[in-house]
Amino acid sequence: MQGRLSAWLVKHGLVHRSLGFDYQGIETLQIKPEDWHSIAVILYVYGYNYLRSQCAYDVAPGGLLASVYHLTRIEYGVDQPEEVCIKVFAPRRNPRIPSVFWVWKSADFQERESYDMFGISYDNHPRLKRILMPESWIGWPLRKDYIVPNFYEIQDAY
């Protein structure tokens, strides 16, 4: 079944794939990485002015990595805001997705965390660097194929 936003995107010739609805009835769409930035700008102009959360996950060992965006359309006088979930998949070898920092400023730390834990590079992000792990850390700890080092010495911060 096609949702309201998916029908609107089809009407305007914007490429996407509908993934149905989640358990709360929120429409979920898949966008290709090369189309994501332009569609993000269009969604912002359409009224999705709030990035509620951004996260990432490893689909399967050796498989794709996913960056997930939960967007909300908040309007004055509307009791129930409209929500949508966007999934952007990237290959494991060179995971690159356009950053939406310049569309929603709240993507800043969230994209940095996804980079730090999964190694997804967000193109045009102004401060894309590790946020949780030390700069000297090797690898991406939340990937399913990550091998935990036997020993890691953290340098004294003082």
Curated annotation (Swiss-Prot):
It is a peripheral membrane protein. It is found in: Plastid, Chloroplast thylakoid membrane. The keyword Transport applies. It comes from the Eukaryota. GO terms for biological process: photosynthesis, light reaction. Keywords: Chloroplast, Membrane, NAD, NADP, Plastid, Plastoquinone, Quinone, Thylakoid, Translocase, Transport. The keyword Endoplasmic reticulum does not apply. One of its GO terms (molecular function) is quinone binding. Its EC number is 7.1.1.-. NCBIfam families: PRK12494.1. NDH is composed of at least 16 different subunits, 5 of which are encoded in the nucleus. This is NAD(P)H-quinone oxidoreductase subunit J, chloroplastic. It comes from Spinacia oleracea (Spinach).
